[in-house]
């Protein structure tokens, strides 16, 4: 849909499949002032013109398309995009307008896809973790986009690393903090993102997975793999600067494993606006944006396995024991023991606990004739999980049973069983009955 304006603004080349081959490629136009030349090692590739390049054939590169607006044969440029939205800049957390961040939308959650996502998560407070899938780069990204790791509570940072490391191990994707290693400019931050909003607003662990790296698949790993140290990643910088040998390696990969697909040889074409041009170059949508079909299942299987594994870490209430002790004269002492069987605590994250974003456990009792001791409804606290333990028992002070709660009542039995409920927004709901007789 049109954005930021409903009507086209400005003139220039608008992307379009002008030669009818079903692809959006590049057009190269011979021009003595052009910034590009054919690579001497493989003339299919275009490389930047050097200072000393005074003679030879040079080109201008334009996206494949048609001219929009009034055509001037002396001035060529790409037209402003008609669809310039970026939904991952439209979430409410630290949202900034178009004048500060392009693609952000007219106001926070203005776009229906984002708004429905926000409303769904706000109405489903049981969500403990959230993953959004994008393409491309072959990385697992985590908060924050706007602040360094020191801004995260230590326990949450430890859990982000623990969860992310497992995904990184299974997929081969590096685990990155966006602020440290996935910024487009060292002087600016990405804002209005899904994962920052989920973590900050809901206190849920959140991830953005950029599926697929054709560069790594082609064996180009320097600055792009799990062994790369912080500050040395090239996921964004590669498109601004890389040795031509790496592009030749990528081209060889296409020749050897994709039957040449991924790169289209330059073909002469009589353009209706520009006259004679050549159309060809990298097929970005096929090669970079998405895994080619032959690689798709192998790329997605470990990601699916990781997401299922993440869900297994969520808090989960279980009834450990219930005890009915007769006291005589129709009185009973009733005791209920409930555990958190999950790896995460019932509150999920320190962010949620500090922000009071998750209610404590609620316990309800009904069906008795008279309540002698205890409360019909109780608002209790949270239960810890396994993640609160250190990785090694060295210097460990011992394990408290902080994963467990015990509730007791003294009641006079009624005509039927005494029912109990235990409820928690994130850890689930339990129901049962004490077997007592009047």
Where are these regions (language model features)?
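Hydrophobic alpha-helical membrane-insertion segments
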Residues: 26, 30, 141-143, 219, ...
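C-terminal beta-sandwich/jelly-roll accessory domains of carbohydrate-active enzymes
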Residues: 333-335, 339-438
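Metallocarboxypeptidase
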Residues: 67-327, 332-333, 337-341, 366-391
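Residues in and immediately flanking transmembrane alpha helices
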Residues: 34, 145-147, 223, 348, ...
């Amino acid at each position: 849909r049109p954005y930021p304006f409903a009507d086209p603004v400005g003139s220039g080349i608008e992307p379009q499949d002008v030669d009818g081959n079903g692809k959006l490629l590049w057009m190269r136009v011979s021009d003595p002032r052009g910034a590009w030349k054919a690579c001497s090692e493989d003339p299919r590739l275009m490389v930047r013109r050097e200072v000393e390049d005074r003679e030879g054939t040079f080109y201008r590169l334009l996206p494949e398309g048609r001219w929009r607006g009034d055509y001037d044969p002396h001035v060529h440029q790409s037209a402003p995009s008609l669809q310039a939205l970026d939904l991952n800049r439209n979430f409410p957390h630290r949202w900034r307008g178009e004048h500060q961040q392009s693609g952000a939308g007219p106001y926070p959650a203005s776009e229906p896809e984002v708004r429905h996502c926000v409303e769904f998560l706000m109405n489903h407070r049981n969500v403990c973790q959230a993953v959004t899938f994008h393409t491309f780069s072959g990385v697992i990204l985590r908060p924050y986009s706007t602040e360094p790791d020191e801004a995260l509570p230590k326990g949450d940072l430890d859990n982000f690393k623990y969860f992310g490391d497992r995904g990184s191990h299974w997929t081969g994707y590096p685990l990155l903090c966006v602020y440290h290693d996935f910024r487009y400019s060292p002087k600016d931050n990405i804002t209005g993102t899904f994962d920052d909003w989920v973590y900050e607003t809901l206190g849920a662990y959140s991830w953005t997975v950029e599926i697929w790296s054709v560069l790594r698949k082609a064996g180009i790993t320097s600055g792009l793999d799990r062994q790369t140290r912080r500050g040395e990643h090239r996921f964004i910088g590669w498109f601004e600067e890389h040795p031509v040998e790496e592009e030749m390696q990528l081209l060889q990969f296409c020749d050897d494993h994709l039957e040449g697909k991924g790169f289209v040889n330059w073909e002469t074409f009589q353009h209706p606006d520009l006259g004679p041009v050549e159309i060809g170059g990298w097929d970005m949508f096929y090669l970079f944006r998405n895994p080619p079909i032959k690689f798709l299942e192998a790329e997605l299987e470990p990601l699916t396995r990781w997401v299922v594994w993440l869900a297994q870490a969520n808090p989960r209430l279980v009834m450990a024991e219930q005890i009915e002790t007769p006291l005589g004269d129709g009185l009973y002492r009733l005791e209920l023991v409930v555990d958190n069987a999950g790896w995460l605590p019932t509150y999920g994250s320190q962010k949620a606990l500090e922000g009071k974003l998750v209610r404590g456990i609620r316990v309800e009792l009904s069906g008795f004739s008279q309540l002698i001791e205890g409360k019909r409804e109780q608002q209790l606290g949270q239960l810890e999980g396994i993640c609160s333990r250190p990785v090694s028992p060295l210097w460990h002070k011992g394990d408290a049973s902080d994963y467990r709660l015990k509730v007791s009542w003294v009641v006079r039995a009624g005509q039927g069983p005494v029912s109990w409920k235990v409820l928690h927004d994130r850890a689930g709901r339990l129901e049962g009955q004490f077997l007592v007789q009047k």
